[in-house]
Amino acid sequence: MRVLGIETSCDETAAAIVERDDMGEGRILSNVVLSQIAEHEPYGGVVPEIAARAHVEALDRLVDRALNDAGLKLYEVDAVAATAGPGLIGGLIVGLMTAKALAMAAQKPFYAVNHLEGHALTARLTDGLPFPYLLLLVSGGHTQMVLVRGIGDYERLGTTIDDALGEAFDKTAKLLGLPYPGGPTVERMALQGDQKRFALPRPLKGEARLDFSFSGLKTAVRQTATELVPLTDQDVTDICASFQAAVADTLSDRVGRSLERFKTEFPDCATPSLVVAGGVAANKTLRAALENLCTRHGFAFIAPPLNLCTDNAAMIAWAGAERAATQAPDSLDIAPRSRWPLDEKSAPVFGTGRRGAKA
């Protein structure tokens, strides 16, 4: 089965075609991503209206390029999939409406994909990973520990009770006057700094629950920087290094407890695995810390290639292909959802508003 996937949930416009065979093995035929960093850089963050307009301008040509790169015509794909949430509602509408129109024009089945499910299933595309496994999803909008039992069968073990980790990286960069996007910049500066100079907190470290918290760490960074004004270049690199070390320690503690829980629930699992996905998973220091943690606990550490950690359409096409193997297509009247928890059975951490559960 060949599936055309479309991703427009935030500030990347993407289209891809993925093939899934009868044995469940996947192959990426094309994967095109257009970043909007240049459009949002002057504002220090993503502006939803600008993002939606950029998706409108770029998506048609990206779909054409994805088809051309795969050597296919639209009628030769077997299904169309698009991100329906969670994300910025304007961007979701652009991608969802485009995908519906293509599916209707080509008379192909349509699948509305949860963006988080795309991340959750990427390791099955790249590594053929069997169920069950643990997923650490770390991005600008989400920080979650998820038990993946099967397609559509997810249990949220822990989530952030305040800021997502990617947001904490971006806010730290902004506090220090570093350019957007903040995550890669903080990582690069940290390589030159002294991680022991500042004793920053490790939020929730040692607690039995599996949730995350990063707002206190972000506040500590702001207080440290304020006390040092005017900041020298060495101050900035040392703060970045101390911040990143605190994050690595916090993740190792939180994830380590999740690994122990997994072993208790699945004592007979032959190859227990931790999958790390999301944009923050591209951070090499954090990946190394988590890989060492997995080695100590007897887990396989699986991180998709860096270009599949950040937002892309290959993961959306693959999630659509996985669902198509066992589930009926979605109706074309399905609506986008700015909030769409991966595990809708769990109680929302932040409560429920008019638009649904927040996390």
Swiss-Prot record:
Free-text comment on the cofactor: Binds 1 Fe(2+) ion per subunit.
Known function: Required for the formation of a threonylcarbamoyl group on adenosine at position 37 (t(6)A37) in tRNAs that read codons beginning with adenine. Is involved in the transfer of the threonylcarbamoyl moiety of threonylcarbamoyl-AMP (TC-AMP) to the N6 group of A37, together with TsaE and TsaB. TsaD likely plays a direct catalytic role in this reaction.
Required cofactor names: Fe(2+)
One GO biological process term: tRNA threonylcarbamoyladenosine modification
Main location: cytoplasm
Classification via SUPFAM superfamilies: Actin-like ATPase domain (SSF53067)
EC number: 2.3.1.234
Keywords carried by this UniProt record: Acyltransferase, Cytoplasm, Iron, Metal-binding, Transferase, tRNA processing
Domain of life: Bacteria
Protein name: tRNA N6-adenosine threonylcarbamoyltransferase
A Pfam family of this chain: TsaD
UniProt xrefs under HAMAP family: TsaD
One GO MF term attached to the UniProt entry: N(6)-L-threonylcarbamoyladenine synthase activity
